[in-house]
Amino acid sequence: MAAAAAAAAAAAAGDSDSWDADTFSMEDPVRKVAGGGTAGGDRWEGEDEDEDVKDNWDDDDDENKEEAEVKPEVKISEKKKIAEKIKEKERQQKKRQEEIKKRLEEPEESKVLTPEEQLADKLRLKKLQEESDLELAKETFGVNNTVYGIDAMNPSSRDDFTEFGKLLKDKITQYEKSLYYASFLEALVRDVCISLEIDDLKKITNSLTVLCSEKQKQEKQSKAKKKKKGVVPGGGLKATMKDDLADYGGYEGGYVQDYEDFM
């Protein structure tokens, strides 16, 4: 009996040890880390993985923000380069304008020019300055080299050629004060008429002949008017004397009245 009681006590003690072992196994789900603590501060296994994923999302957001901040810097640098190019062109253009202006104000002394040549030179320099200003405006505002005026025209109808002729006339006649204007027109008319037929040449010749006759009539009339100014017509002597005496007749007729009674 005593032996049976001892065996029962030993079995009960074994069960107690087994239960204690099961009790200590409850710490297994908690992951230990170096230093005696748990990962993430007493968190259950699996919680730290969620936190790691969240940290990665934040990293992605930070990278996107950095890329967004870099792009404006690239755009600003490109704009800065364009602005520097524009300023450089403006400086070059301004230098050219100053040189042209200096030549306009101070003509070359070593070369003696006639008034006509001086006028032609000034017109040429003025044209260069206008072209320079136009080119600067185009470069500044990014305008294409669009052609205007005579160069832009391609006449095909009668009205087109009429408008084309007006533009040519305005362009050419601005140099009519030049000493070489007449010889220039002579050569120009001859050159542009070379390819014409005889009938067309006759029409142009007749038109110029009529123009020449009209100019001759105007010249004769102008000379006749100049001659008439030096001749006093009939009765002019009496009228002239009367006007001279009127300057001295201050009293109700005066010398003028006496002169008329005498006559």
From Swiss-Prot:
Modification type Phosphothreonine: residues: 114
Residues that span the membrane, as ranges: none
Compartments in which it is found: Cytoplasm
Protein family membership: Belongs to the eIF-3 subunit J family.
InterPro entries the UniProt entry points to: eIF3-like_dom_sf, eIF3j
Annotated region (Disordered), positions in chain: 1-115
Keyword line: Acetylation, Coiled coil, Cytoplasm, Initiation factor, Isopeptide bond, Phosphoprotein, Protein biosynthesis, Ubl conjugation
A single MF term (Gene Ontology): translation initiation factor activity
Residues where Phosphoserine is found: 16, 18, 25, 132
Record has Acetylation as a keyword: yes
Coiled coil: 75-140
Modified residues (N-acetylalanine): 2
Region called Sufficient for interaction with EIF3B, residue ranges: 6-74
Chief location category: cytoplasm
Source species, domain of life: Eukaryota
Descriptive protein name: Eukaryotic translation initiation factor 3 subunit J-B
GO CC term, one of those recorded: eukaryotic translation initiation factor 3 complex
Protein source organism: Mus musculus
Phosphotyrosine modifications at: 259
